[in-house]
UniProtKB/Swiss-Prot annotation:
Active site (record annotation): 329
Protein's name according to its UniProt entry: Probable serine/threonine-protein kinase 010L
InterPro entries associated with the record: 2-cysteine_adaptor, Kinase-like_dom_sf, Prot_kinase_dom, Protein_kinase_ATP_BS, Ser/Thr_kinase_AS
Lineage: Viruses, Varidnaviria, Bamfordvirae, Nucleocytoviricota, Megaviricetes
Sequence ranges assigned to domain Protein kinase in this UniProt record: 181-526
């Protein structure tokens, strides 16, 4: 659009935050939020501001950043992205602290007592920030689990000061925020709500601004009452479990959640009061879709995709084995990415087998558990899912032993359950098995519902297939729509073919447990990555990055 410049784009950015019907910076007319003109102006302004930042111009048009300073403002105020920590060489931080320390699972509203002085190199990062401008702290070349936990520790200390006053009245991303020290920018919207990029000045004495993501989700009046009684949304409870995986060195491929607050009025246009929750999380600067633009050498493309696929299946394995969680919405938009140096390797241990995973510069992050379900009895839900077969113990066991039940619980309105005789298949070789709290289905063998490896829920299959089809293309399993897929090397398409070509039906193959269990699938696909040496973890190897035990003993999770 002709007439747009840095000044008008800055005014447009302010207008969007103040009103859901902002005025056009060109015509002065009110524009519908997320309408075609609104989107066009937003997109063009993003380009203008990005080009201005690249030129070193002041995209904040004035001294907006100076308001965070204590005392007189500096001689000049620069753009947010103009001065980043000047890391000339990637630094890999040894993560022995994260896997050998006595770390406790995440308590509600708090991150951990992981002290920042334990993280080598953080003081050096602070000193390299520009002395007269707020800089954004990026993970790209300093990405490691201890570094993420250190940032979380600082957020915890920050929120301890405000949670008593603002726990149920913190409207950061609303049109009329209740706190003045956050600066927000909307980066995504959907039927679930809004995701915003938020800058907090908690490091202002070091002249560093740390970004984070805030997910605003609408909640009903009944959910609000439950929150007041500390019965939080299910998604946040899942996030709490996910945090424990990061704190205990189980798997790094998840988003770290900092805190949850509630806003009593999320909109200023509706006459009806709209309540929402605001979840503070790590911020990542792109989804898996961004790797389509990556230029990878032809001889490295196969290893590049295999590294990403392994890490995603490792995240699925962590939620399956440890909590019985089915994500139900795996797609490229829900796989965020963190960029690394592209050097070295990680070690993932799954059922006693250590896999050396090459670092190809991308760490996929599984996010958004809004429609996820847990079938574990320890998670508090009453539905334990369909359990059609037993998988014998052993990391290389792909056999599936079907069993039968006599009764089938059926859930009706208001979650009222009635018990009916179980149904047989036409050949009368197996029954439809479902387990529910308080109902004895009379199985033909003893069934341990908490053991997700021996008695996996049937819906585990959905996440396994969705990950493969996300790369090859195809229909989604539980949600409407299609996976667009990637331009893959033929070897990767053939690599994923055994998963993609198997239809989802009611009868399970007898020797393909890897279609349900990510732990078995990783052994089936990546057996050549297993480290068969009996040596200890190579902490002194300069190429070694971090170690994760994806399937730890149950005692480690409950300690």
């Amino acid at each position: 659009m002709n007439g747009l410049n840095v000044k008008k784009c800055y005014e447009w950015d302010i207008a969007k935050k103040k009103s859901p019907l902002p005025k056009s910076p060109l015509t002065g007319r009110k524009l519908k939020q997320h309408g075609p003109t609104w989107k066009k102006i937003t997109a063009e302004c993003a380009t203008i501001m990005r080009e201005a930042r690249n030129r070193g111009s002041d995209t904040n048009y004035g001294s907006r950043l100076c308001k965070w300073s204590n005392g007189p403002p500096p001689s000049s105020c620069y753009s947010v992205d103009s001065f980043r920590p000047a890391w000339n060489e990637p630094t890999l931080i040894n993560s022995r602290l994260a896997v050998q320390g006595n770390l406790k699972p995440l308590p509600l509203y708090e991150i951990s007592d992981f002290q920042d002085h334990q993280i080598a190199g953080f003081d050096r990062v602070l000193k390299r920030a520009h002395p007269s401008a707020m800089s954004i702290l990026h993970w790209s070349s300093h990405y490691s689990t201890p570094f993420r936990l250190m940032i979380a520790y600082h957020f915890r200390e920050r929120y301890k000061q405000i949670k008593k006053k603002y726990r149920f009245n913190l409207c950061v991303t609303a049109p009329r925020p209740t706190v003045p020290w956050f600066e927000t920018e909307e980066i995504g919207a959907g039927s679930f709500g809004v995701v915003s990029r938020v800058f907090d000045n908690m490091f202002r004495h070091e002249n560093i601004r740390v970004p984070m993501a805030v997910k605003r989700t609408r909640i009903s009046a009944s959910e609000w009452k439950m929150a007041m009684n500390r019965q939080y949304p299910v998604e946040y409870l899942f996030n709490k479990v996910i945090n424990s995986y990061l704190l205990n060195g189980i798997c790094p491929n998840f988003v770290l959640t900092y805190a949850i607050f509630f806003c009593p009025n999320c909109t200023s246009t509706s006459s009806r009061k709209q309540m929402c929750s605001e979840t503070f999380m790590e911020l990542f600067y792109g989804s898996l879709d961004a790797i389509k633009k990556e230029r990878v050498k032809r001889d490295q493309r196969e290893l590049y995709f295999k590294s990403i696929i392994f890490q995603i299946y490792a995240a699925v394995c962590a939620i399956q084995t440890n909590a019985g969680i089915v994500h139900n919405d795996i797609k490229v938009e829900n796989i965020l990415i963190a960029e690394t140096s592209g050097e070295g390797y990680w070690i993932y241990e799954i059922h006693g087998k250590r896999y050396r995973v090459p670092n190809m510069g991308i760490i996929p992050i599984l996010a958004d558990f809004g429609v996820s379900v847990s079938y574990s009895p320890t998670m508090g839900d009453k539905d334990y899912g369909r359990r059609q077969f037993r998988v014998p113990p052993g990391y290389n066991s792909y056999q599936m032993e079907p069993f039968t039940t006599q009764f089938y619980p059926m859930e009706g309105k208001n979650r009222q359950v009635r018990v009916v005789p179980t149904r047989w298949n036409r050949a009368r070789t197996w029954t439809w098995n479902k387990f529910y709290s308080g109902v004895d289905s009379k199985p033909s063998i003893p069934v341990d519902l908490a053991d997700m490896e021996q008695f996996p829920p049937w819906n585990f299959h959905n996440d396994i297939v969705d990950v493969a089809r996300m790369f090859t293309g195809g229909s989604r399993t539980t949600q409407p729509g299609m996976h667009a897929g990637f331009h893959l090397p033929p070897s990767i398409r053939e690599f994923l073919a055994p998963i993609v070509r198997v239809p989802t039906n009611s009868e399970a193959p007898k020797n393909k447990a890897w279609l349900w269990l990510a732990s078995r699938l990783i052994h089936y696909l990546f057996s050549d990555w297993i480290d068969n040496s009996n040596d200890s973890i190579p902490y002194n190897d300069p190429k070694f990055i971090e170690y994760y035990n994806v399937t730890p003993p149950k005692s480690r999770l409950s300690s």
